[in-house]
């Protein structure tokens, strides 16, 4: 199982490196195309000159600022162009075909006003069409760039979540190995106490059976998560669409887990902010009101009807970043709740006592 995790981790690393390399290649290719376009524009224009470092025309850090400056410059050039175009049209209307000079009209001349209105109308029509075409092309470019960026972010997020799930698998594997070590220690202790009564032998056998049952559940959960990770990794490598579906499945699984926690917390007390279970040590730890910590230790043996009872209780509070035991209150609630089998009701009473202790 450990070898499978190593193999899966290496595969995820290789795939992630490949995606990052491809993204970097696309970025470098885009920068080269922009660089070539700028150089070609400089070569074909008498008004543009290259200054500074000729080997690095593009500074990525200044790209957004320079892009806005270029937009302003292009707007000024368009206005200059249309002024020249307007002058050209005006001269065409005011100069005869035989190139003879005609009297210059005054600003108040009706014919001058008519020609000026016609030139302005033609200019506005052409500018409107061209600006619409430019806006449409610009919008399409921005839309495609936005879609590419979203897909890249989704792929990167998928690999990050896959890595987090893999870390959880390692934690489960460590827990499983610790349980195996504890089982071996338990077996050694059992071998040294073979002279106990038949009842003790049956109890030890039952405890071993419970431990093996927990190990089997842990092993099944670990194997299921490994299988799910392999499926997610295969989907991420095959296509971006399947990767998005894996992200949705992961989010849905986390939502189900959160919903289960919320229902458990709501059934006990509304001030509970965290619940942690330790199955092997038979402990239950609660975080209440972001200040109090309650630890419940259950009896090793169950009652005749198969129920667990409270064996010990620890209470702590936080004051000025220090954890302080609540000894007096612990004695009281332990005396009241020790041996109780209604765990949920006991937890409600303990939480109320802890919260009301400072009031």
Swiss-Prot record:
InterPro entries assigned: Kre28
Regions crossing the membrane: none
Disulphide bridges: none
Cell compartment(s), UniProt: Nucleus; Chromosome, Centromere, Kinetochore
One example of a Gene Ontology biological process annotation: regulation of meiosis I spindle assembly checkpoint
Organism superkingdom: Eukaryota
One Pfam family recorded for the sequence: Kre28
Keyword Nucleus: yes
Coiled coil start-end: 59-81, 111-132, 210-239
GO cellular component terms, A-Z: kinetochore; Knl1/Spc105 complex; nucleus
Keywords: Centromere, Chromosome, Coiled coil, Kinetochore, Nucleus
Homology family: Belongs to the KRE28 family.
Protein function: Acts as a component of the outer kinetochore KNL1 complex that facilitates microtubule-kinetochore interactions and the spindle assembly checkpoint. Kinetochores, consisting of a centromere-associated inner segment and a microtubule-contacting outer segment, play a crucial role in chromosome segregation by mediating the physical connection between centromeric DNA and spindle microtubules.
Subunit-structure text: Component of the KNL1/SPC105 complex composed of SPC105 and KRE28. Part of the ten-subunit outer kinetochore KMN network that includes the KNL1, MIS12 and NDC80 complexes.
Name recorded for this polypeptide: Outer kinetochore KNL1 complex subunit KRE28
Organism this protein belongs to: Candida glabrata (strain ATCC 2001 / BCRC 20586 / JCM 3761 / NBRC 0622 / NRRL Y-65 / CBS 138)
């Amino acid at each position: 199982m450990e070898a499978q995790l190593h193999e899966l981790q290496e595969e995820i690393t290789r795939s992630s490196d490949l995606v990052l390399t491809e993204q970097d290649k696309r970025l470098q290719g885009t920068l080269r195309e922009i660089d070539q376009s700028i150089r070609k524009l400089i070569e074909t224009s008498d008004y543009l000159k290259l200054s500074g470092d000729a080997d690095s025309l593009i500074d990525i850090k200044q790209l957004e600022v320079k892009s806005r400056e270029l937009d302003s410059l292009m707007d000024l050039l368009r206005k200059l162009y249309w002024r020249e175009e307007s002058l050209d049209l005006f001269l065409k209307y005011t100069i005869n075909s035989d190139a003879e000079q005609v009297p210059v009209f005054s600003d108040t001349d009706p014919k001058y006003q008519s020609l000026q209105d016609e030139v302005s109308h033609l200019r506005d029509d052409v500018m409107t069409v061209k600006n619409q075409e430019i806006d449409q092309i610009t919008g399409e470019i921005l839309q495609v760039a936005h879609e590419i960026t979203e897909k890249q972010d989704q792929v990167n997020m998928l690999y990050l979540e896959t890595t987090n799930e893999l870390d959880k698998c390692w934690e489960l594997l460590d827990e499983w190995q610790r349980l195996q070590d504890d089982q071996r220690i338990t077996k050694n202790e059992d071998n040294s106490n073979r002279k106990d009564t038949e009842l003790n032998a049956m109890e030890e056998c039952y405890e071993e059976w419970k431990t093996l049952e927990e190990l089997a559940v842990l092993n099944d959960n670990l194997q299921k998560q490994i299988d799910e990770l392999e499926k997610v990794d295969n989907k991420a490598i095959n296509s971006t669409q399947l990767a998005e579906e894996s992200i949705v499945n992961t989010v849905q699984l986390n939502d189900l887990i959160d919903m289960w926690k919320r229902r458990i917390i709501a059934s006990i007390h509304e001030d509970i902010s965290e619940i942690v279970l330790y199955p092997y040590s038979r402990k239950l730890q609660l975080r209440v009101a972001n200040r109090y910590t309650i630890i419940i230790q259950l009896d090793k043996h169950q009652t005749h009807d198969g129920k667990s009872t409270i064996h010990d209780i620890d209470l702590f509070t936080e004051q000025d970043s220090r954890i302080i035991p609540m000894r007096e209150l612990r004695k009281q609630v332990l005396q009241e709740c020790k041996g109780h089998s209604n765990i949920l009701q006991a937890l409600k009473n303990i939480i109320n006592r802890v919260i009301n202790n400072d009031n």
